[in-house]
Amino acid sequence: MFHLIPFVVAFLLVFLTWFLIKKLRKVIIFELDQNSKHFGGELVADVLKAHDVRFLFTLCGGHISPILVAAERQNIRVIDVRHEASAVFAADAVSRLSGTVGVAAVTAGPGLTNTVTAVKNAQMAESPIVLLAGAAAGLLRGRGSLQDIDQLSLFRPLCKWSGRVNCVKDIVPMLCKAFYLARSGTPGPVLVEFPIDTLYPYSLVRQHLRISDNPQSWRQRFTNWYLRFYLFRLFANGFRIQPCLPGQVPTQIPVEIPSIPWPSTKSIDQLVWLLSQAKRPVIVVSSQALLPPVPATQTAEHVKSLRIPVYLTGMARGLLGRHHPCVFRHARRAALRVADLIILAGSVCDFRMDYGRVLNRKAKIVIINRDKKQLYLNSDIFWRPYLAIRGDVGTALKELSISLNDRFPCLSDFRCPTEWVGELLAREHHRDEEIRQSSLTQPAERINPLSVLWQLEHNGLTDQESIIVADGGDFVGSAAYILRPRGPLSWLDPGPFGTLGVGGGFALGAKLCRPQAHVWVVYGDGSAGYSLAEWDTMARHKAPAIGVIGNDACWSQIARDQLGLFGSNVACGLQSTRYDLVGAAYAGADPLNSTLSVEDSGAFLVTEKNLDNLSDYMAHARELSDRGLPSIINCNIAASGFREGSISL
């Protein structure tokens, strides 16, 4: 037995040597320039530049200062907001309108936790976002450092992927991976955490580690050795890819093409056949149809070429313009209950489709979606797809259009039966007239909310470039019946999460993407309270929006049903606050200054006494926007029963 001991010891020594070499080989062969002035924030900025990031939304913090400074040097426009949630909302808007990845950077701890709602909203809206978060230094993680929490565990359920940069050399590959994953498959948010010492220069980090130049004891010597080893591992080979000079294009950064599921030719051929046999077809197009790689304008043409009734939801509102004959907005439930072919192009059977209960069970139901889970959501309960196509929705619509018009010449003259279209048109015109008549009646006090929205539709949104941002409950829900987005990507709403507070951030991102457009934020008075502070951001960065607030001094969407069900409106009341003055003050104006008219400061109050001025106020607000000034039109509206019973449970 004892004769085996030398062999066991030798084996253990060999194993230990192999283990140490495996663990340390990357450090051993790496080099470190202790005199380098470069810092990790420069590498972050280079990756952003390589991925065509034009805007970086942030609220400053010491953990992320190197990123912000380096981004500015790379001519990336750094937009500092008043709340971290608005930074993510703005990045979300940029990703939706530009087809690129939106990027936000926030500091550690509360800076990051303030974004939770906005990140979850982006996840459910399928918006590709890269969120850069500061963090405590690696040495101090879990030791009570300032703003140190387990950020990755908190955000893992909210993101497609979350990762931590542990050393400078990992910055470029990890960020490139983040951009790739954000756009691949079903898009969504990703989080990259940067410990503070990965972003600052070597000399500064070494200084803060307080390495002793003359250790007096074995403990100090060991501590010095450990700190030097940590420092070496942190920076070794970190700048093998040299940071670019300001304005220089980073050519060494790899940019991967995202992986996107494509619809099969067989499934498209099946859909063509189903469409050719249908007598009462209808297509419901939603946000996923507007994702890259197919441009939204091309998707619009493909949908038009189908020549069948279309309902547009989410970001797809406005896809076919304001008055296309195939677009219907009202009585969708009635249409879906009698249609014999229902194509859900990016739409899913969640609460917006009453979980599938509104679909005709005898109809052939075709659903197209990138996400396998969304394809079959609630299909085991209320509905069942006849054909489920997993793939990019825009590509599927493109292939369907080509197949219907080119690959199958016998179907090129396909037309939807006129009786079916006539039935839908009759319902559409009837409902439009009902709404118009409802907008004409004025209460004794305050204003009919429908008349405000009617004027906004006909006197406010006067140009094709207008963008509508929807942020609210009851007033915004009414707006969806009246306002007609002017073209593709001209409507922004939170999506299925139903988030309040998106208005300021969405408007900021929209105006930066489309500086020539007038951006209108349709606010409820409750939701306006979340993001009016961003009027300060808009003024500072010359990215103005026009806010139209339906102010009924109430959380009306909740109060209406709560009062009816329980006889109490507790916690639903608000004040008739002068939000117009609040917005003007945030924008840097002094609305109480006697030398300046209230309207010239961007503050417009509309009551029953001056309702006739609303059209002029809207024109004045557009003029202010053209001069780079944001404004608020605060409309004191009356309670309305227009959307009674609309609460979703």
Curated annotation (Swiss-Prot):
Record-listed E.C. numbers: 4.1.2.-
Coiled-coil portions: none
One Gene Ontology term from the biological process aspect of the record: isoleucine biosynthetic process
Transmembrane regions listed in the UniProt entry: 2-21
Cofactor(s) in the UniProt record: Mg(2+); thiamine diphosphate
GO CC annotations, alphabetized: acetolactate synthase complex; endoplasmic reticulum membrane
Catalytic activity of the protein: 2-hydroxyoctadecanoyl-CoA = heptadecanal + formyl-CoA; (2R)-hydroxyhexadecanoyl-CoA = pentadecanal + formyl-CoA
CDD domains per the UniProt record, alphabetical: TPP_BZL_OCoD_HPCL (cd02004), TPP_PYR_POX_like (cd07035)
InterPro entries associated with the record: DHS-like_NAD/FAD-binding_dom, THDP-binding, Thiamin_PyroP_enz_cen_dom, Thiamin_PyroP_enz_TPP-bd_dom, TPP-bd_CS, TPP_enz, TPP_enzyme_TPP-bd
One Gene Ontology MF term: magnesium ion binding
Its biological purpose: Endoplasmic reticulum 2-OH acyl-CoA lyase involved in the cleavage (C1 removal) reaction in the fatty acid alpha-oxydation in a thiamine pyrophosphate (TPP)-dependent manner. Involved in the phytosphingosine degradation pathway.
Family, per entry: Belongs to the TPP enzyme family.
Protein name, per record: 2-hydroxyacyl-CoA lyase 2
Organism lineage string: Eukaryota, Metazoa, Chordata, Craniata, Vertebrata
Gene of this entry: ilvbl
